[in-house]
């Protein structure tokens, strides 16, 4: 393995661990929506400062960033509710796995992507893993996780378009800014201003660290895809579903260690086949 590919491998695996870590923090939070709000708000402020410092290019196409921020709001609401309802080792793998699959289907429908026979096999395998995970979950819990996955797919498609028509780095920064804005607006309209202010005063450091972790996860993936094929990086990145299955069953004491880890591995295998078929 060359030094460049090794660097990409380490970056992608680190991103997987970091993404699983901040989701674990959200799951363990007393008020999960508030935790996600604080995380996205601090990331959004940081993103805006950096974007202004480096300069927003003339002719920047704003609508994808705004649309992505709005979709991320619904993703955050759905994710918080799903973590309230279901186990970590069920919600996360179903949401991430279904999100990747729906994004692949959406790419065919809306972005002129094409599915090869191997990609179809990968989708079938991943769907099988998701069915195994959902089979022993309450219907409401499984549907909530699938709802999260639909928003993952939706913002992934919008961001794919947005990164193609804009500078990818500045666009990524402004996604966080738009998400923080819409999430804050939602909280204010829901009458949670006092809770938000109190939480920011007492937990600003944790919010900032979680926000930095969220942003850093994205940047690690961006750096990795410059050094290795996108499919290779994506497959490693989605290894987080196995990490979460292990953490949920071993660290959080959730039931079904072998079944959930096995099903998560099947989801990961399907995603690996999917990206290998590109």
Placement of each model-derived feature along the sequence:
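Structural motif at transmembrane-helix junctions in multi-pass transporters
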Residues: 30-35, 78-96, 111-114, 164-171, ...
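Selected transmembrane alpha-helices and immediately adjacent juxtamembrane segments
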Residues: 140-172
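Alpha-helical transmembrane segments of compact multi-pass small-molecule transporters, enriched
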Residues: 41-46, 94-109, 121-124, 178-182, ...
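Membrane-interface interhelical linkers
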Residues: 1-70, 74-88, 135-146, 177-227, ...
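Residue positions within transmembrane alpha-helices of multi-pass solute transporters
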Residues: 17, 21, 74, 98-102, ...
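Hydrophobic transmembrane alpha-helices of multi-pass small-molecule transport proteins
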Residues: 44-47, 101-108, 115-135, 259-278
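Hydrophobic/aromatic positions within or immediately flanking transmembrane alpha-helices
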Residues: 12, 36-37, 65, 92-93, ...
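N-terminal hydrophobic targeting segments
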Residues: 64-127
């Amino acid at each position: 393995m060359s030094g460049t590919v090794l660097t990409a491998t380490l970056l992608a695996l680190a991103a997987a661990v970091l993404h699983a870590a901040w989701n674990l923090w959200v799951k363990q939070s007393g008020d999960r929506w508030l935790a996600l709000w604080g995380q996205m708000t601090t990331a959004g402020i940081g993103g805006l400062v950096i974007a202004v410092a480096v300069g927003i290019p003339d002719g920047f196409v704003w609508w994808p960033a705004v649309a992505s921020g709005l979709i991320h709001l619904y993703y955050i609401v759905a994710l918080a509710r799903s973590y309230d309802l279901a186990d970590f080792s069920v919600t996360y793998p179903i949401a991430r796995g279904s999100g990747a699959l729906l994004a692949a289907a959406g790419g065919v429908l809306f972005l002129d992507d094409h599915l090869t026979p191997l990609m179809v096999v990968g989708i079938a395998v991943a769907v099988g893993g998701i069915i195994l995970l959902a089979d022993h979950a309450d219907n409401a819990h499984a549907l909530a996780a699938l709802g999260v996955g639909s928003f993952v797919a939706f913002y992934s498609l919008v961001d794919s378009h947005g990164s193609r028509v804009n500078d990818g780095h500045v666009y990524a920064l402004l996604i966080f800014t738009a998400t923080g804005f819409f999430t804050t607006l939602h909280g204010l309209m829901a009458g949670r201003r006092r809770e938000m202010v109190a939480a920011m005063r007492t937990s600003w450091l944790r919010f900032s660290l979680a926000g930095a972790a969220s942003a850093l996860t994205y940047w690690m993936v961006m750096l990795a895809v410059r050094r290795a094929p996108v499919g290779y990086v994506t497959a490693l990145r989605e290894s987080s579903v196995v990490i979460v299955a292990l953490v949920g069953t071993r660290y959080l004491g959730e039931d079904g260690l072998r079944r959930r880890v096995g099903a998560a591995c099947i989801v990961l295998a399907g995603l690996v086949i999917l990206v290998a078929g590109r």
